[in-house]
A protein has these predicted regions:
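Short amphipathic helix-loop junctions that connect adjacent transmembrane helices
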Residues: 29-46, 235-251
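Symmetry-related core transmembrane helices of the 12-TM Major Facilitator Superfamily/SLC fold
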Residues: 167-183, 373-389
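Cytoplasmic helix-loop-helix junction between adjacent transmembrane helices
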Residues: 106-144, 327-328
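Conserved MFS/SLC helix-loop-helix module at the cytosolic interface between two early adjacent transmembrane helices
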Residues: 61-98, 275-278
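Structural signature of the two symmetry-related core transmembrane helices
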Residues: 78-93, 172, 282-297
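Central cavity-lining transmembrane alpha-helices of secondary-active solute carriers
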Residues: 51-67, 258-269
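Paired small-residue
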Residues: 90, 101-109, 294, 305-313
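Juxtamembrane intracellular "pre-TM" segments in multi-pass secondary transporters
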Residues: 1-6, 188-219, 403-409
Length: 409
């Protein structure tokens, strides 16, 4: 990488650290925050936790391709700054809400600007040589993972000591800081000498995706993966309450969230390097099967620390899925359309984020927590099977020639 690109990676690592840390500071106790608005039944809280999670991603699902295209045309740096400011403002105002509807509407507003981390991936991806894309994207992800690791525990401590409202205010300050950091980056686009087209119409981008069946499959299973991953998020703190009790609940829920982040942090960069060497699709299939197998025991634990251990082992596998997926898109999509392709990828991920929390809330409300883990496990294994079948059916398209991959741009 060029010196300016390395500097950008360094800055965006810290920006992602602050954004991810800030977002996960409040995620573990959204359901607990809703409980403070009135005397509600457990089923009511579980259902509204799911809807409040999901509404952010409804807006993000609609706006992600738009932001991606704007980024391709006018620069991703501007989009990153707007995203940070929009998220920071909405989270700041969440500290003043008095009803679940007010929280719901602010989460909707936040969704319009959500996408800082995916946009930062596009920002760095376009200035990264293809042969090291997995390692670089894995390195970038360690920033958000480290933030995610520290965020829940810090959020739990702040919530227990100062209350939920003050935690939202501190969270917004961190996100505003991330937007400020972006000002010190320099936008660079590493053009391939074979890429003569400098811009593509939306129709051309969609046709490119359709004509590359493995790329299309990777984008589509992004939704399934997120359905699986986010189905547990809204009810994890309630599950911790069942296993551990209500004492210092926000703190212990934060630890459960962070355990997955620790495993993720340890392996994200390593999975990227492995995929650079052996092929992104093959490693992605392996990771999906492993994640499915590791998720299953979570529904049958009998104490809190068993859940923490399982969350850690799950994080080891989940850590590679996003950087490997982004690196594959970097390889298959021309630079001039990468923002929009990644926008569709992000949009489908957010679509999964819409379905996942609602599904998790409904399943846990009617069938119990264990059923959520079983469903999640099956969805991840199904995603791996779909990608495996697609790879076998389109071998020539899916094949990743190491010599081709290692050619410098």
């Amino acid at each position: 990488m060029k010196p300016d690109s390395k500097r950008n990676l360094f800055i965006m690592w810290f920006a992602n650290f602050f954004v991810a840390g800030s977002m996960t500071m409040v995620l573990p106790f959204i359901s607990l925050y809703i409980e403070t608005f009135g005397n509600f039944s457990a089923t009511y809280v579980q259902h509204w936790s799911g809807w409040t999670f999901a509404i952010t991603f409804v807006a993000a699902f609609l706006f992600s391709p738009i932001w991606g295209r704007i980024g391709d045309l006018y620069g991703r740096k501007k989009i990153l700054i707007a995203s940070g400011l929009g998220m920071g403002l909405s989270i700041f105002l969440m500290g003043y809400v008095t009803s679940v509807w007010q929280l719901f509407m602010l989460r909707l507003f936040m969704g319009i600007f959500t996408g800082f981390i995916p946009m930062s991936q596009a920002f760095i991806s376009t200035q990264t040589p293809k042969n090291i894309a997995g390692k670089v994207m894995g390195t970038l992800q360690t920033g958000s993972i480290t933030g995610s690791l520290m965020g829940p525990m810090l959020g739990g401590i702040l919530a227990d000591q100062f209350g939920f409202a003050h935690t939202f205010k501190w969270t917004s300050i961190s996100i505003f800081l991330s937007a400020l950091l972006v000002l010190f980056t320099r936008e660079i686009i590493l053009q391939n000498k074979d890429d003569k087209i400098t811009s593509y119409s939306s129709k051309a981008v969609i046709l490119h995706i359709i004509r590359h069946p493995i790329l299309l499959t990777v984008l589509l299973i992004s939704a399934l993966i997120q359905v699986a991953h986010f189905s547990i998020q809204p009810i994890l703190s309630l599950y911790v309450s069942k296993l551990h009790g209500s004492e210092n609940l926000a703190f212990f829920a934060g630890i459960a969230f962070s355990a997955g982040g620790l495993g993720n942090l340890m392996m994200a960069r390593q999975w990227g390097k492995i995929a650079d060497r052996y092929g992104y699709i093959k490693i992605l299939i392996i990771l999906l099967f492993m994640a499915g197998l590791f998720y299953l025991p979570g529904g049958f634990v009998t104490n809190y620390w068993q859940l923490v251990i399982i969350r850690f082992t799950l994080g080891v596998t989940i850590g590679g899925i996003i950087p490997v997926r982004i690196a594959y898109i970097r390889q298959e999509a021309p630079i001039a359309m990468q923002g929009e392709v990644l926008g569709y990828n992000t949009s489908l991920r957010f679509f999964g984020n819409i379905i996942g929390p609602v599904m998790g809330g409904l399943i846990s409300g009617y069938f119990g927590f264990s059923a959520v883990f079983v469903t999640t496990s099956l969805l991840l294994i199904l995603s791996g099977l779909i990608l495996l079948l697609a790879m076998n059916r389109h071998t020539q398209v899916a094949g990743i020639n190491l010599e081709k991959k290692r050619m410098p741009l």
